[in-house]
Amino acid sequence: MTADTETNVVEVDARGLRCPEPVMLLHGAIRRSPVDGLVRLIATDPSTQRDVPQFCRFLEHELIDSEADDAGDLHSFLIRKRG
């Protein structure tokens, strides 16, 4: 996990990890972030496309952006922590 100091985005690199590890790492990063803090999750597990939006809805965080590379092998999610 790294922090981009220019934009205050915490980056969670979950490449190579399988369910449920990417969401567990995301949950930990969100818990440590301040309200309105941004967390970017980068993952290769295709189940994150289903799990991350559900995680955000369930815990009422804002999914700002969701992208996949052209091959669909790399997934990126930008989440804003809500109060």
Question: What feature does the model see in each segment?
Answer:
Residues 2-14:
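Right-handed parallel beta-helix/beta-solenoid
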Residues 12-68:
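Amphipathic, hydrophobic secondary-structure cores in small proteins
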Residues 7-10, 62, 77:
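Residue-level marker of intrinsically disordered, low-complexity segments enriched
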